[in-house]
Amino acid sequence: DRGGARAAMTLHSDLVAGRWHTMSLMDQLGNAGSEVSRALRARENGNASRERSALHRFLELMDLTIADARLRGRRRELCRAREVVCDYFVGDNAYRSTPESLDRYFLAFAKAARRGR
């Protein structure tokens, strides 16, 4: 059942319903970055299942961000950020990312979002 598979892929259903596209870019990337942090922590603790789940949530949030019409001019950077995270977790780490560099990149957005409140 394709509909069931689609529903299973939607981990953040309330966000898909429209709330995500009302959030600022800083909030969106801060939230996506939280999933990166969770994936990094799970990897450090040897929990492949939690790592994979957090990575899937990150990908869903990044895909929602990339699809946000307000951010059309930022798609290249957003796609690159998504690519770098995927490269680290499931690729050859061609970008030579470290857990610290990934955390630092996304933490900057979370801090900016908090300052903006």
For the regions a language model picked out, list residue spans one by one.
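Surface-exposed peri-terminal alpha-helical interaction modules
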Residues: 1-117
